[in-house]
Amino acid sequence: MIQNKNRQPDLYPVKGRYSPGEPVSLMLETPPDFADEVAITCMHLEVCLFEARCPVTGGKEQILLPEFPGDFLGLGVRARLYKDGALRATLYTAADISEPGRVVRYGFLSDFAAEDADDDGDVASMAKYHINLVQFYDWSYRHDQLVPPSEEYQDMMGKRNSLQCVRRKIDACHARGMGSTAYAAVYAASRPFWEEHRDWGLYALPGKPLVFIDTFYFMNIAETCPWHGHIIEQYRNVMAEVGFDGIHMDTYGYPKTALNAAGEPCELKEQLPKLIEDTAAKLRVGDREPR
């Protein structure tokens, strides 16, 4: 829950994004006896779209604005607080009215412990700052097996996660107009996976695998390597089984060039676009584009 610890009046959107035609809900927080009336003015650029006055009782109160037509509409909101007819404070906020993916303001989550499953305060805080797409960082089981085999699990760095928590955070994002993307490196694998698929790996020198922090083994993303299809299938599993809206396909910034298992040079700048295109094609469902 968002708490106004300073006991100062505050105004903020309940959602990071509102769909066209959806009523806009705002949260007004005021200390007890601070105000008895609020005057709301909604603007788009210099055009006034809506004005209203309503009583204030103190504490947290939701203000429901009407539907506003059109897509890609930035709504500026001013709230003037009055007590016995005297102006006490003027507050400002904004609301984004747009279709999913029209504009992106990116946030992230990284805590998915079982004890956090019922706490959506982090997501509520991001809505306050108009975040509309959230990356779930380090949520997965393994980089080569993203979906965990059990409800509670440890990731490759030993962090304990809960799949129930991940799913509830996704639901919390959706309830606040935010999409969710699953962090997933495009070419990282665990040592056991690499040992079983050495011919899928990338190498600094013949026989010398590329490894990041002695943990993540680089794999060959070329279309001709089975890793290409393997990681795309992992992405499909993530969306189908966990409920994410898309994938954050991460790279580590290097290497630019490496060797495949046969000692042949691989130019990643040529291979990454193809991996992205193939992933988008596999994850597309009807007219729904992955995020």
Task: List the model feature ranges, each with a label.
Residues 223-291:
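Active-site neighborhood of glycoside hydrolase catalytic domains
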Residues 105-108, 134-136, 180-182, 247-249, ...:
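Hydrophobic faces of well-ordered beta-strands that scaffold small-molecule active sites
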Residues 99-102, 112-116, 182-242:
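Active-site-adjacent "subsite" loops/lids of carbohydrate-active enzymes
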Residues 49-102:
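Extended acidic/polar, glycine-enriched regions
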Residues 1-20:
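Short, compositionally biased P/S/T/A/G/V-rich stretches that sit at domain boundaries
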Residues 89-142:
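An acidic-aromatic substrate-binding cleft motif
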Residues 24-32:
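Aromatic/hydrophobic beta-strand junction motif of beta-rich domains
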Residues 122-167, 187-214, 222-223, 256-257, ...:
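Aromatic-lined carbohydrate-binding/catalytic grooves of carbohydrate-active enzymes
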